[in-house]
Amino acid sequence: MPRRPSGGGGGAGPAAAAVRKVPLRKLLRAASVACGVQFGWALQLSLLTPYVQELGIPHAFASLVWLCGPLSGLLVQPLVGHLSDRIAPAASPLGRRRPFIAAGAASIAAAVLTVGFSADLGRIFGDSITPGSTRLGAIIVYLVGFWLLDVGNNATQGPCRAFLADLTENDPRRTRIANAYFSLFMALGNILGYATGAYSGWYKIFPFTVTPSCSISCANLKSAFLLDIIILVVTTCITVASVQEPQSFGSDEADHPSTEQEAFLWELFGSFRYFTLPVWMVLIVTALTWIGWFPFILFDTDWMGREIYRGSPDDPSITQSYHDGVRMGSFGLMLNSVLLGFTSIVLEKLCRKWGAGLVWGVSNILMALCFVAMLVITYVAKNMDYPPSGVPPTGIVIASLVVFTILGAPLAITYSIPYAMAASRVENLGLGQGLAMGILNLAIVIPQVIVSLGSGPWDQLFGGGNAPAFAVAAAASFIGGLVAILGLPRARIASRRRGHR
């Protein structure tokens, strides 16, 4: 695989480069689709693990449902990135990235409708509406929608990241700013999504969502997904109309899409042999970081409902306590997103001052401390005397919310720095930005597969609950932090304004 010239090449002279320098305000609009995508993702993270347990899947197997996310991401995001790299910019009136962004958004809209109405569709397929019964039809419909939702998420976010990388022309500073904009919109989508999930009165605003097969909690979820579609359509239109895609790139891939194309998987995995040590370090730290994040993503609100509020989604006598905990967890995730947004604003200054590697490493160690704090809170709550149907002590709830909030800072860094570092370091390998984002995605989804497969056995091995997964998360985050501090550059990537390695 040939290296491309460090100047960007492709016959584009200085004038073309000047034309391609997109104003920051247009980069801001180009990143806005992250708000719509993340709104639905926030609902997925906060509400769907509890909801699938309501449908009848046991807690020990709930993590297996999330396998569809990393498995679809394992192929969908690299494939979409590869295909968008190969499209000649002039071949489509929307360029080469925006058609995939629009198609992914349409998939998300179809998916959330399927998930939201899964209980009603399950009733059509013969499900019982008796409380506590397993609804096989609804589970099947839910799984189809869940898979489609993850495919849509991967098909949208990958091309959007590559779109931003194209617009910034691999300038490290502008790339970090563009990814910070993306993180800022993700934070806004998170805030809106988690606030929507924390509100329990949507069924009153949309009374048609309550049906014999869809209880109040189900109707609230259904209403939230209807709001998601509105926000997704608006933000997708803003992104697609924001800026014209560059007509010239640093590689001749797009100019000759029908020649010299290697088989996709061979190109994806074969590119590994060209990676330098710094690229491998970025991928290793990314993998360890996501081994840390995924247990929290899977079980954050479930942890609040089970361990803190002592409820259960499959025991009618304490179901209300569980839902109260889930809503409180959604509120905590909303606070998390506020800090995420603030961190996204100041992240560029932090990287300039301390270096991207050090900032990333310190954030991972902070993650580890937060997960250890969750284990301590779990232990303290378990040994306190309050009834399952009662309200947990205020101190325990506040401590849990503080941990949820603090985790917003490292989450903002996870959403930004790995992508910026990958974009600036992989460019000279002869890869398009779409495939580069797909390769980074492998370092995200493979750890998610490991956690999804391991969470159930860890749960059963240690007597149930979410503590074992959080212990693994703490260890992986701490190791990832040390590797980032010792193995990634501190100042070099932050001090360079232009050019390539």
Curated annotation (Swiss-Prot):
Residues 53-55, 120-135, 198-222, 300-327, 378-394, 455-467 are extracellular. Widely expressed. CDD domains: MFS_SLC45_SUC (cd17313). Gene3D superfamilies: MFS general substrate transporter like domains. InterPro entries: MFS (IPR011701), MFS_trans_sf (IPR036259), Suc_symporter_pln (IPR005989). The chain crosses the membrane at residues 32-52, 56-76, 99-119, 136-156, 177-197, 223-243, 279-299, 328-348, 357-377, 395-415, 434-454, 468-488. It is a multi-pass membrane protein. Pathway: Glycan biosynthesis; sucrose metabolism. Residues 1-31, 77-98, 157-176, 244-278, 349-356, 416-433, 489-501 are cytoplasmic. Keywords: Cell membrane, Membrane, Sugar transport, Symport, Transmembrane, Transmembrane helix, Transport. GO terms for molecular function: sucrose:proton symporter activity. One of its GO terms (biological process) is sucrose metabolic process. It is found in: Cell membrane. GO terms for cellular component: cis-Golgi network; plant-type vacuole membrane; plasma membrane; vacuole. PANTHER family: SUCROSE TRANSPORT PROTEIN SUC4, SUGAR TRANSPORTER. Homodimer. Belongs to the glycoside-pentoside-hexuronide (GPH) cation symporter transporter (TC 2.A.2.4) family. NCBIfam families: GPH_sucrose. Responsible for the transport of sucrose into the cell, with the concomitant uptake of protons (symport system). May also transport other glucosides. This is Sucrose transport protein SUT2.
